[in-house]
Amino acid sequence: MNDFYHVLIKNDGSIIHDVFATSHKDLICKYITPADDSKSYFRAMYSPKMDCRLDDLDNYQIIISENYIPDWFQGSLAEDITVKLREVIESMIVRGHKQLLLHDGAILVGTAVVQELKQSIVFAMYDHARIKSLDKNSEIHHVTDECIIEEMHDSTKIEELSGFAKVNTMFDYSKIIKMWGQSKVNIMNDNSRIAMLKGDANIISMHDEAQADRMKHMSKVDEMHGHSVIEEMWDWTIVEKMFDQSRINYMDEESKVCEMFGDSMIEVMCGNAIVEKLCENSLVRKLHDAAQILQKELE
């Protein structure tokens, strides 16, 4: 993770950091006063080495974000700061049960269980970690392995869902930026949104005004209901069934819809896109290239 973890290291051995800081500028604006000499501190990242997990404390390194290394950062002072930085990350790691994380930053590992997350950040979830309720604008940067989030509410966000990770239900304006691997979302409700599905990512059912912006590779949606929308389908993506007034705006390449019912609609089909069966009042507005509808059973 390129943005983990911003710190300012001071010449008195203290470390300035904040789990909600997204840049060194944030830390400087909040914690550095006009009385502080610019040479009394330096900007750095405390990050794991490439491809290492965030809980792998033995593989962290200090990456100095300056054009120079201060003369005072050496010897026992440098050693003490390294120990303190390790303790900062260690304090974030949750391995057991937590009833609530509030205004907090965490890394969930093993069989960790958090009942409720409010206005907090989870930098990563690994192994079999679980969150029951993600709420109040909380966010998770990376979810992988066989981790589970039971419910997403409010305007909560997951940046990346991968591996065999799963979200059971999305509500309100909750959002996932990218799904890949064999990750899964069971139910999307309200105005929930997924920006990108790749790999073998799967949505079981979409309802209400739920939306998926772009489907790639072999990702799949089992069922679309209500006024749910998919903006684009590419590659070998599949939608099994469309109902009600669900809509797909654009299909291309080898993408496929198996069955359409109710007043469901596809705006444009291009490439070799296919609808296997068009039923009831369902509609495809425009066909281009070799796109085709294989069977019609309209009312």
Sequence positions of predicted segments:
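Short, glycine-biased loop/turn motifs at secondary-structure junctions and
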Residues: 1-299
